[in-house]
Amino acid sequence: MSSAEALAFDVIVIGGGHAGCEAASAAARAGARTALVTHRFDTIGVISCNPAIGGLGKGHLVREIDALDGLMGRVADRAGIQFRLLNRRKGPAVRGPRTQADRKLYRLAIQQMITEQENLTVVEGGAADLVCDGERISGVTLADGRVLKCGAVVLTTGTFLNGLIHIGEKRFPAGRMGEKPALGLSERLLSFGFTLGRLKTGTPPRLDGRTIDWQSLDMQSADEEPVPFSLMTDRITTPQIECGITRTTPETHDIIRANLHRSAMYSGSIEGIGPRYCPSVEDKIVKFGDRDGHQIFLEPEGLDDDTVYPNGISTSLPEDVQLEILKTIPGLEKAVLLQPGYAIEYDFIDPRELKRSLETRKVCGLFLAGQINGTTGYEEAGAQGLLAGLNAARRAAGSEPVILQRTEAYIGVMVDDLTSRGVSEPYRMFTSRAEFRLSLRADNADQRLTPLADEVGILSKERRKRYLTRETALSHARMVTQSLSITPNLAGYYDLRLNQDGVRRSAYDLLSYPDINLDRLIAIWPELASIDPVTREALEIEAQYAVYMERQQSDIAVMEREERLLIPSGLDFDAISGLSNELKQKLKQRKPETIAEAQRVDGMTPAAVALLIAQIRKFGGRQKLAAETLEGKGAA
């Protein structure tokens, strides 16, 4: 790293968390000479808070990261110690794969992948400043004075950007417990004209599992047949563990109420807004004080680690109050506190400052991913990191960006939400955020996104081969089941109750019936028994949703047409007669590039959209649709 040549890269990624690792890996896979700048190599891939990956909505993101040949799914499969498929009894569209992860195994697995990745160099050091050539990023200055030159930068600072930890009345600068914050970068971002805000998150105390009375607790087991995240994982081999379940008590609540004035959250010390769906225990007691207790999951942090994460009691109360609280919780009366819970505040940038490529609008070549964009969660961060890293590599190479639409992926939904609506609190993914969740299922992420990954050059040969093998098997099974048919009368002999309308139905059609699966059809057509279990499940889900998917495709087509209807860059919003001054101002500030994007501007009504479309036609005549996409303009 001593020569000038060694200090030049195509892409520099700042931060070695979940967003940074995915960004660095994606950029390197895309062929960019990539540097991952982090304070210390041994902190790459650290799970800062909850030792779990996936869940409702989040599991979909992990599957999509994996479909794009990212790291998180494979790493979680190696490190997972309690796999559970959430919403198993509900439809496949809302099922959420989740695993509790061994912190050490997770960190070591991702560090190994980073080390083995071609085109990727880890640079230990702190990023002190961003270097620009006019309005274009050109490098990064490190705290020790080194200057790294580049064509694009991905900033993934997590909670480190002006991070401030709160434990009761105490507060001190930190990125997370025991690590220095990133100072100075906020001032540089402000100098670029970005709008910064403060957000907050928190974490519970860590406990010594040897001092917990496990015998008095209910226990939750892992699934008997763990469902992996990654297409590349044949089966889970890591030992699976149980978690304990306990609850807070009225005595717990009394202690919290009596000490609310000492909580950083309620004393006025914290300015940042916390995540709505991960409230502190103080919030739970204040907002849901009528409940007798709140559930706590006691999650071991590793196979050879006695540390336990009590999921459900995130707090910023003083350490002495935290100790008193533990004494009132069944099973934790004698628990030893290894690390107090705390809240942490950090800077973020209004994500409306970003294009959908995750490149900033103000500085060419500067990309942002993760909590700096106002999101919360490893999965949200990793998904943004992958997209930002890929597009940073493409920016450095002079190629057009990759834009994921809302109709294509949960990643597209998230990025569109962030860049068009912004955030008033930390954003997390739910299946309910997607209009087309029947087609955006966790089980079909590979079908939706792996061909794209192959097209843009970030897919490994091994994954391509495995994907094509699976798709060939599914295509063959589909063809076979569509070629086999039966009359309603004959179906009755096999105890299949169909409308007696005389219409023959294929085996594929029959799989759409709620009480019919492949096992029942094998009695009629024994040759179906040769379909392997993985293909069988995929076929059953596909057939189950086939009718609904046909209906949804028309809705998707409407949205895609709106995504392609471009707003000319020179359109004068002030000239649109009938549009309110408020909307004119918002449109000028937001600068939407398509009608679909304009529709998501706060306050836009159907009448306002009609006025905008009329002005577009007056401005430039008939707009090109499919031929002139966002990518073609390079606007995103």
Swiss-Prot record:
Sample GO molecular function, one term: flavin adenine dinucleotide binding
Localization (cell): Cytoplasm
Keywords annotated in UniProt: Cytoplasm, FAD, Flavoprotein, NAD, tRNA processing
Family annotation (SUPFAM superfamilies): FAD/NAD(P)-binding domain (SSF51905)
Cofactor: FAD
GO biological process, one term: tRNA methylation
Gene3D superfamilies referenced in this protein's UniProt entry, alphabetically: FAD/NAD(P)-binding domain (3.50.50.60), GidA associated domain, C-terminal subdomain (1.10.150.570), tRNA uridine 5-carboxymethylaminomethyl modification enzyme MnmG/GidA (1.10.10.1800)
GO CC annotation terms, alphabetical: cytosol
Top-level taxon in the UniProt lineage: Bacteria
Stored SMART domains: GIDA_assoc_3
Binding-site residues, FAD: 15-20
Classification via PANTHER family: GLUCOSE INHIBITED DIVISION PROTEIN A, PROTEIN MTO1 HOMOLOG, MITOCHONDRIAL
Function: NAD-binding protein involved in the addition of a carboxymethylaminomethyl (cmnm) group at the wobble position (U34) of certain tRNAs, forming tRNA-cmnm(5)s(2)U34.
Family, as annotated: Belongs to the MnmG family.
NCBIfam families referenced in this protein's UniProt entry, alphabetically: mnmG_gidA (TIGR00136)
HAMAP family: MnmG_GidA
Protein name, per record: tRNA uridine 5-carboxymethylaminomethyl modification enzyme MnmG
Species assigned in the record: Brucella suis (strain ATCC 23445 / NCTC 10510)
